[in-house]
Curated annotation (Swiss-Prot):
Organism field: Corynebacterium jeikeium (strain K411)
Keywords: Methyltransferase, S-adenosyl-L-methionine, Transferase, tRNA processing
SUPFAM superfamilies (alphabetical): S-adenosyl-L-methionine-dependent methyltransferases
GO MF annotation: an example: tRNA (guanine(46)-N7)-methyltransferase activity
InterPro entries listed in its UniProt record: SAM-dependent_MTases_sf, tRNA_(Gua-N-7)_MeTrfase_Trmb, tRNA_methyltr_TrmB_bact
Name this protein carries in UniProt: tRNA (guanine-N(7)-)-methyltransferase
Annotated PANTHER family: 3-DEOXY-D-MANNO-OCTULOSONIC-ACID TRANSFERASE/TRNA GUANINE-N 7 - -METHYLTRANSFERASE, PENTACOTRIPEPTIDE-REPEAT REGION OF PRORP DOMAIN-CONTAINING PROTEIN
Annotated HAMAP family: tRNA_methyltr_TrmB (MF_01057)
Binding residues annotated for substrate, in chain numbering: 161, 193, 233-236
Length: 254
């Protein structure tokens, strides 16, 4: 593999120009970000003050540096990566219900991370950390092999236009990368309310040999506690309002 665009990051900011992107050479499909601009957005004065005070401890920006998770969290515990945490409403609501686990929220959108940061600080939540960057690049560069007990991808952008399907995060290469970061027995949980994206995922459920596809148990007591969303996410709520069918997918690392 080849690293591309190694611009130096500044705290809390992404490097200028094309986003960091690894050129994988393993024959699998990986999301291609393309030449489009991410939503920048602005923070309120209060958000900016909280960001400046708390981000250095609770947040990191995408970098070519593997995280020492026990050091970052000040404890050794099962760690779950949530890829695409958005505004973090459900992340902040779930974290206190699983206080024994470490949660790493990965998101590109700074205002979304700022909202989550505010919820974490005001709620005195101690088990959430944040990384600003593309989910695939964060998995590739910042998590060691077999370092995660779970990965969550809840209601990812469906990129509905056919020419944009290459940007969908659920690809054969992404599943392979996630499998390499999961510990044996670790769980991958994906949820979507987009029918075409569900069909896309259906075609990939058996593609990664390191992952055992579990489907979605009819008996709710069989759902691994590690993956219990417990609260309705923002985009799940929008889907339910439109009477969309929620599809859930579970895999276990062999």
């Amino acid at each position: 593999m080849v690293w591309m665009n190694n611009s130096e990051n500044t705290p809390g900011s992404l490097p200028p120009g094309r986003p960091l992107q690894t050129e994988f050479n393993d024959g699998r499909d990986y999301p291609r970000l393309g030449n489009f601009s991410f939503r920048r957005g602005t923070l309120t004065d209060n958000q900016e003050a909280l960001w400046n005070e708390h981000w250095p401890k609770l947040g990191k920006v995408l970098a070519d540096e593997v995280i020492d998770l026990p050091e970052w969290f000040d404890r050794d515990a099962e760690t779950i990566a949530e890829i695409g945490s958005g505004t973090g409403t459900s992340t902040a609501a779930m974290a206190p219900l699983e206080a024994e686990k470490n949660i790493v929220a990965v998101e590109l959108y700074r205002p979304g991370l700022a909202k989550l940061l505010g919820s974490v600080v005001r709620g005195d939540i101690h088990n959430v950390r944040m990384i600003r960057g593309d989910g695939v690049e964060v998995l590739q560069r910042m998590f060691a092999p077999e370092s995660l007990s779970g990965v969550r991808i809840y209601f990812p952008d469906p990129w509905p236009k056919a020419r944009h399907h290459k940007r969908r995060i659920v690809q054969s290469g992404t599943l392979h990368l996630i499998a390499s970061r999961l510990k044996p027995g670790g769980i991958l949980h994906i949820a979507t309310d987009h029918a075409d994206y569900a069909e896309w995922i259906d075609e990939l459920v058996e593609v990664e040999e390191q992952l055992e596809y579990l489907g979605w148990p009819e008996d709710q007591s069989d759902i691994p506690q590690l993956t219990d969303r417990q609260v309705i996410t923002k985009f799940e709520g929008k889907g339910l309002d439109k009477e969309h069918i929620i599809r859930e997918y579970l895999w276990r690392k062999k």
